[in-house]
A protein has these predicted regions:
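Short beta-strand edge/turn micro-motifs at domain boundaries
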Residues: 104-119, 130-169
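Structural motif
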Residues: 75-77, 149
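Short, cysteine-centered beta-strand-loop-beta hairpins and adjacent loop/turn segments enriched
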Residues: 88-105
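Short structured motifs
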Residues: 66-70, 127-129
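C-terminal motif of bacterial Sec signal peptides marking the signal peptidase cleavage site
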Residues: 2-4
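A short hydrophobic beta-strand element
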Residues: 79-89
């Protein structure tokens, strides 16, 4: 009788599950994930000054978010791996371009001359939300590096820059 040798769970499956654990709450607009991202967004910008609810902005930003794992390749030494993931998301650059277009249209109207500063800030918020809502998601290929650390597959710190690049492509 041959004894089965098992070196533990399949690295590709473990890494795929880790990616799903991180991206599924975003894809599914999980309330805890939305709240965490909204808190981060509100701490970085005074969205409330423009009448923007942080959670609503995050939901608009994540509209259409999706991902698909293209491949997970483990290095020959078994200590590192690369996951290729197609991330579909809205681009802040595209939303900013759209906000500029809407702002130019608004600035050309006579409406702006009769507005108080509060009304103008509210209008800016409306423009930002409209631009984000109108921005179509696009797909960007991201490459996530993993390392086997003390028996656990861990995503490298470079993942943040990959996600940043996807949202600012």
């Amino acid at each position: 009788m041959l004894a089965a040798c098992s070196s533990g769970p399949d690295p590709e499956e473990v890494i795929s599950q880790d990616i799903a654990t991180q991206f599924d709450p975003i894809k599914n607009l999980d309330q805890a994930a939305v709240d965490e991202l909204a808190q981060d967004a509100e701490s970085g910008a005074d969205l409330s000054d423009f009448g923007i609810d942080g959670a609503e902005y995050i939901k608009a930003m994540l509209g259409g978010f999706d991902y698909s794992i293209v491949s997970v390749n483990v290095a020959e030494d078994g200590q590192s791996a690369t996951a290729i993931v197609n991330v579909t998301c809205k681009s802040f650059n595209a939303a900013n371009d759209r906000a500029n277009e809407i702002s130019e249209e608004f600035a050309a109207s006579d409406e702006i001359t009769d507005m108080s500063m509060d009304d103008l800030n509210k209008k800016i918020g409306e423009i930002l939300m409209q631009a984000m809502n109108e921005t179509e998601p696009s797909t960007v290929e991201c490459e996530f590096q993993y390392n086997l650390v003390d028996g656990t597959w861990t995503m490298s710190d470079s993942a943040e820059s990959e996600i940043y690049n996807a949202f600012f492509s």
